[in-house]
A protein has these predicted regions:
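Bacterial N-terminal signal peptides
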Residues: 11-20
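A beta-strand edge to alpha-helix "cap/lid" segment located at domain peripheries
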Residues: 23-157
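Bacterial N-terminal signal peptides that target proteins for export
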Residues: 2-12
């Protein structure tokens, strides 16, 4: 009888250990009332607005090992973004148009978004520039940060 209880207990533990990773990687879309999704969207908004003004968001927003791909296909790092954040700005009317957060477990999210700015293209100072992007967020040490970003310039609506 005791052996049967031990086997039942061992089976329950094994099943739990197998199911926990499956549960942890379930995906879900962030809802309007999700506190973490709201935080992520707000930080994305600040980064989009940071094209126009130095709002100091980059230092905490991007992970130290961040890698991005620009609209021209060039790679950039957190150090590149910090330098860019301190440079002279020509853009105005910067803003976030859309951001949708898709969570994968409790520590990873992918954000699909779009933004705009006027005057970002120095060769056309009055032209509106629009881009869509995908940012990958990771929660490490209790903090959410962007670890990767890919930008793509698109025709403005």
């Amino acid at each position: 009888m005791r052996v049967m209880h031990i086997r039942t207990f061992a089976s329950a533990i094994a099943a739990t250990l197998l199911l926990v990773p499956a549960y942890a990687h379930q995906s879900r879309w962030g809802s309007a009332d999700d506190k973490t999704a709201k935080y992520i969207v707000e930080m994305e908004r600040k980064w989009a607005e940071g094209v126009c003004v130095d709002n100091g968001v980059v230092a905490n927003l991007l992970a130290d090992d961040f890698q991005g791909t620009s609209t021209q296909g060039a790679r950039f790092t957190k150090a590149d973004e910090l330098k860019d954040e301190k440079s002279v700005r020509t853009a105005h009317d910067c803003g976030l148009d859309e951001a949708k957060v898709h969570f994968f477990g409790n520590s990873m999210a992918v954000v699909y978004g779009s933004e705009h700015a006027v005057g970002k293209d120095k060769s056309q100072p009055n032209a509106k520039v629009c881009q869509v992007w995908t940012d990958t967020w990771l929660k490490r040490g209790g903090s959410w940060q962007i670890i990767a970003s890919h930008d793509n310039r698109v025709k403005c609506p």
